[in-house]
Amino acid sequence: MSTTTTTLHTTTGTVYVADGTTDGKIGYYNHTDDSTNVIRKPIPIQVEDARTLSKSPTTKEEGYQLVDFHTKLPEGHFLDSKSPENKKVIEQVYFDECRRLVQEVTGAAEAYPYVYRVRNQEQNAKASNKSNFHTDFVPVVHVDRDDITAPQRLRASLGAEKAEMLLSKYKSYGSINVWRPVKNVVQKWPLMLVDHKSIENWDYSTHMFTLHSSNDERVATRGAKDHETILTHDKRYRYIYASDMTPDEAWLFFAFHSDPALGIPHGAFWDDSTKEEALTRCSIEVRIWVFFD
């Protein structure tokens, strides 16, 4: 990872946030026909390059951190991640690499990797404007879980008995993402993190929008989820990314934390400086339950 003290570098781009509903009712999304009443609002943003910040963010203070990370697995395992053989290797070898990294960086007393996602984002900004909330390349800013849906997923991941034991044993917990490019330097759709430290008492209930889903086939693999949690706009947000991320770097960030101050809304964003010939962005993220004394 390269971090300098040079002049702050920024770029501009666009993300989408939730801006209420068309009918004033609870937000919904139907997976069967892609129907929704949610108003998706494009927001032009100025994004700060983490490499040129005067102070490097940390998971303990800001909820996110850019780190060096070298896996011993060849990239082929990630590029063909759905094959049973590669899936097994990722869940055994890569999960353990991520677990050790996360515990070393965050100081978590216990850590349990529970799922991974490999994404290929190749479309352009115009295509993203026509897409639904759940395609890989839609830059909708969100958190993976909130204070309602996190316990649901924790119980589904670890079993109700173990989940309750861990919740009673530790003072705080979270779901941390280890997000890393695969194969190429990121040239398109970099990951953007929202820093809300300047907003006192920021909370999931005050600055996030709940989107209720129906007919979601993913329930079979990830467990029940009461709703998705999408960001609403606030002019006080700071937007952070890392320029030219390589496969030997990773973002660590809390996609949920029991202390909302450390929960980080995130999403891909369209960088206005993206070149026409930019390569498809391939990335892998591993989600890990972490517990703190």
From Swiss-Prot:
Keywords: Oxidoreductase. One of its GO terms (molecular function) is oxidoreductase activity. The keyword Oxidoreductase applies. Its EC number is 1.-.-.-. Transmembrane segments: none annotated. Pathway: Secondary metabolite biosynthesis. Belongs to the asaB hydroxylase/desaturase family. Oxidoreductase; part of the gene cluster that mediates the biosynthesis of squalestatin S1 (SQS1, also known as zaragozic acid A), a heavily oxidized fungal polyketide that offers potent cholesterol lowering activity by targeting squalene synthase (SS). SQS1 is composed of a 2,8-dioxobicyclic[3.2.1]octane-3,4,5-tricarboxyclic acid core that is connected to two lipophilic polyketide arms. NCBIfam families: CmcJ_NvfI_EfuI. This is Oxidoreductase clz16. It comes from Cochliobolus lunatus. The lineage of its organism: Eukaryota, Fungi, Dikarya, Ascomycota, Pezizomycotina.
